[in-house]
A protein has these predicted regions:
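Ferredoxin-reductase
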Residues: 39, 45-119
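An N-terminal, well-structured beta->alpha segment
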Residues: 1-64, 70-71
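Conserved small/polar residues in nucleotide/adenosyl-binding loops
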Residues: 121-123
Length: 123
């Protein structure tokens, strides 16, 4: 993957095709690069990460956390939780930000995404 799939970047999150077999716009490699980029450009030391139950989520969450960790970020793995739980963690736990691996309101099982916040700000 040389370029970011720009059409997946929305106003408040990242969403796109993410099949459980690792194909689509949002691949495990994309998630790893996203973790590395967030660690590099946001300058956070700790991140909370939650996830939903879509087929593609385990690989995306694992690679996102690996990218964050390999860049020096301490990751608090919240497990399978709601998006609200990740936001609550950002407000109440000693973390600099959070990421929820979810396609949010999209009903298609072939899609997934990332909702991110930095402190109390959605990014």
């Amino acid at each position: 993957m040389d370029e970011w799939p720009e059409h997946c970047f929305k106003a408040y999150d990242i969403r796109g095709l993410a099949s459980g077999d690792g194909t689509g716009d949002l691949t495990p490699q994309f998630a790893y690069r996203l973790g590395r980029a967030m660690a590099t450009y946001l300058g956070c030391k700790t991140f909370a990460v939650g996830r939903d139950i879509r087929d593609s989520t385990p690989a995306l969450a694992s690679e996102l956390m690996r990218g964050l960790s390999e860049s020096g970020v301490t990751v608090k793995d919240l497990g399978i939780v709601s998006t609200g739980c990740v936001y609550h963690a950002c407000w109440t736990l000693p973390v600099d930000g959070g990421v929820m691996v979810t396609a949010s309101h999209l009903p298609m099982p072939t899609h997934n995404g990332f909702k991110m916040c930095l402190s109390l700000i959605h990014i």
